[in-house]
């Protein structure tokens, strides 16, 4: 067998031998992710006390053995060794059906469980985003973006496409290190590859226009579009292209980047779905207009990432040389970043669901047991020698018992009801303004989410809070076509878009060429 050249992968080698140790060597502590073909647990190695992440590969959907996506992920991860790529430590097995699988249908004739053992990471970007009140500083954004691009450049040099870059697949530890994770959709490629590749990859909000238009021949540029969406999300404080369907996703891209034609994207008219999904009217590019509040160097880099024509899109290596990373404030040292309580998207999603459940239960309880209304009517008054009770209230001008009283004269500025004034004249600005009146973007520091001044460089909190969706991370699930789920590749369902052509975002696609 031919040896791979230095710095290149040899994907012709057989998959690594696993199963030398049992999962009983680990104690499961807490579930931190879940996806279509697996769960992820934080676990402790009993002998050493080391904390790891155990990703269980679900076998009940596979009739003839090991899932091809898991084989591909293992082969790639065993050969990628970089500080910004998640480390697969080993494979362990469980000889029989786990307690987690009791009662579940089993279509696989091969019994037992298989686990991938990863280094443990404290957070993913989506989990941090759900922490209220936290924001990234400009040096933090630069630090994380630099690590993301460095890891992705390493993958591309080694001819690996990630094909699912999104916040929940970017893992961060409490030493500030960011690592690419969830290589379940990754695959090797070569520039002279003549076969077709699937376009059913990359979560919808981060999917580039060429895939949405049906391209089956593509390269590293697809990952760079996703990086551009992440970059803008960090600067803007929320996802920039939250489409619900493929048509809506393309429309959002057109509204931001302009509608494609032969002048700005040669050959686009020959794309398989161009005629069915082209813009109904010509649209101009508005990236600079919409994000004019961004730092000048940040906007220049973003413009080069969000280019419709993939052949003109900036590559990871050139992005690392952009002025953005070499002007003040410079990227901070990862070790200078603050530490946070563990923030896995799977966990934060469960907390949000529990809060919604509690709120709904409280509303239901209130409807079923309304508070008793107490009468506020004054007691009846009886005059001396009167045989009948006097009316409780004097008759109004239109009451049948009052035939003589003229209708009241309503003075200007008052509000009358039944002949009696209610309230005073309208008061302008009755409630003083409160909260952030500047729109939420820190123009002074150029890059955070809120209007206040940033904390000292390198000590800020992560980027803003807001609804998020699936979890990715260690590769628990295949493409998460809506944004939600569990870290390490888990993908529970939360609401980050939908995959109109594949059902739920956690749909198992099996073989992904």
Swiss-Prot record:
Q: List, in alphabetical order, the GO biological process terms annotated in this UniProt record.
A: carpel development; flower development; mRNA processing; regulation of viral process; response to virus; response to water deprivation
Q: Which residues cross the membrane?
A: none
Q: One Pfam family name from the record?
A: Pkinase
One GO term of the cellular component aspect? nucleus
Where does the record place the Protein kinase domain? Answer: 26-325
What residue spans carry the region label Disordered?
Answer: 337-513
Gene3D superfamilies in the record, alphabetically? Phosphorylase Kinase, domain 1, Transferase(Phosphotransferase) domain 1
EC no. given is 2.7.11.22, 2.7.11.23
Q: Where is the composition biased (Low complexity)?
A: 395-404
Record's compositionally biased regions (Polar residues): 434-448
Q: Which GO terms describe its molecular function?
A: ATP binding; cyclin-dependent protein serine/threonine kinase activity; kinase activity; protein serine kinase activity; RNA polymerase II CTD heptapeptide repeat kinase activity
User: Which residues are named in the active-site annotation?
Assistant: 164
Q: Binding residues for ATP, per the UniProt record?
A: 32-40, 55
Q: Which SUPFAM superfamilies match?
A: Protein kinase-like (PK-like)
The protein's annotated catalytic reaction(s) are: L-seryl-[protein] + ATP = O-phospho-L-seryl-[protein] + ADP + H(+); L-threonyl-[protein] + ATP = O-phospho-L-threonyl-[protein] + ADP + H(+); [DNA-directed RNA polymerase] + ATP = phospho-[DNA-directed RNA polymerase] + ADP + H(+)
Where on the tree of life does the source sit, at the highest rank? Eukaryota
Where are stretches of biased composition, namely Gly residues? 461-476, 483-496
User: What are the UniProt keywords, alphabetically?
Assistant: ATP-binding, Kinase, Nucleotide-binding, Phosphoprotein, Serine/threonine-protein kinase, Transferase
Q: Which residues form the signal peptide?
A: none
The free-text tissue note of the record is:
Highly expressed in flowers. Expressed in seedlings, roots, rosettes and stems.
Q: PTM Phosphotyrosine: list the residues.
A: 37
Quaternary form? Interacts with CYCT1-3.
Q: Which family does the record claim for this protein? A: Belongs to the protein kinase superfamily. CMGC Ser/Thr protein kinase family. CDC2/CDKX subfamily.
What is the designated name of this protein? Cyclin-dependent kinase C-2
Origin species, per record, is: Arabidopsis thaliana (Mouse-ear cress)
């Amino acid at each position: 067998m031919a040896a791979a050249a230095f710095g290149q992968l040899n994907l012709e080698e057989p998959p690594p031998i696993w199963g030398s140790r049992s999962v009983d060597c680990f104690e499961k502590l807490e579930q931190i992710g879940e996806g279509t073909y697996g769960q992820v647990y934080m676990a402790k190695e009993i002998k050493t006390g080391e904390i790891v992440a155990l990703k269980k590969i679900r076998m009940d959907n596979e009739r003839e053995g090991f899932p091809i996506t898991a084989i591909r992920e293992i082969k790639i991860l065993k050969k990628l060794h970089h500080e910004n790529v998640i480390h697969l430590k080993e494979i362990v097995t469980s000889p029989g059906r786990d307690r987690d699988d009791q009662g579940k249908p089993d279509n696989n004739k091969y019994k037992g469980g298989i686990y991938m053992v990863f280094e443990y990471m404290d957070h993913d970007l989506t989990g941090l985003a759900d922490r209220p009140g936290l924001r990234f500083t400009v040096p933090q954004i630069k630090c994380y973006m630099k690590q993301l691009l460095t890891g992705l450049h390493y993958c591309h040099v080694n001819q690996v496409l990630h094909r699912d870059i999104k916040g929940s697949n970017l893992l961060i530890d409490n030493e500030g290190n960011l690592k690419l994770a969830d290589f379940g959709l990754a695959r090797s490629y070569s520039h002279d590859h003549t076969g077709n590749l699937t376009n059913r990859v990359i979560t919808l909000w981060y999917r580039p226009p060429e895939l949405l238009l049906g391209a089956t021949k593509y390269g590293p540029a697809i990952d760079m579009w996703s990086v551009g969406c992440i970059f803008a999300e960090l600067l803007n404080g929320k996802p920039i292209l939250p489409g619900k369907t493929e048509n809506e996703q393309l429309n959002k891209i057109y509204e931001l980047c302009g509608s494609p034609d032969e002048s700005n994207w040669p050959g686009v008219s020959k794309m398989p779905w161009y005629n069915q999904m082209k813009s109904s009217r010509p649209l101009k590019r508005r990236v600079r207009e919409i994000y004019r509040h961004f730092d000048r160097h940040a906007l220049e880099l973003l413009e080069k990432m969000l280019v419709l024509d993939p052949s003109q899109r900036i590559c990871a290596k050139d992005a690392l040389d952009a002025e953005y990373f070499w002007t003040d404030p410079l990227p901070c040292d990862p070790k200078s970043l603050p530490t946070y309580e563990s923030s896995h998207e799977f966990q934060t999603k469960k907390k949000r669901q529990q809060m919604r459940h509690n709120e709904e239960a409280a509303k239901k309880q209130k409807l079923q047991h309304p508070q008793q209304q107490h009468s506020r009517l004054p007691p009846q008054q009886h005059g001396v020698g009167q045989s009948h009770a006097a009316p409780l209230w004097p008759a109004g001008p239109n009451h049948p018992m009052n035939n003589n009283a003229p209708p009241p004269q309503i003075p200007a500025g008052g509000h009358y009801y039944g002949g009696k004034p209610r309230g005073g004249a309208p008061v302008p600005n009755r409630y003083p303004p409160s909260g952030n009146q500047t729109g939420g973007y820190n123009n002074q520091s150029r890059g955070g989410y809120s209007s206040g001044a940033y904390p000292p460089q390198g000590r800020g909190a992560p980027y803003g809070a807001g609804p998020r969706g699936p979890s990715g991370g260690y590769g628990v699930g295949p493409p998460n076509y809506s944004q939600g789920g569990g870290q390490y590749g888990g993908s529970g369902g939360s609401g980050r878009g939908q995959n109109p052509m594949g059902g739920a975002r956690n749909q198992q696609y099996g073989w992904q060429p």
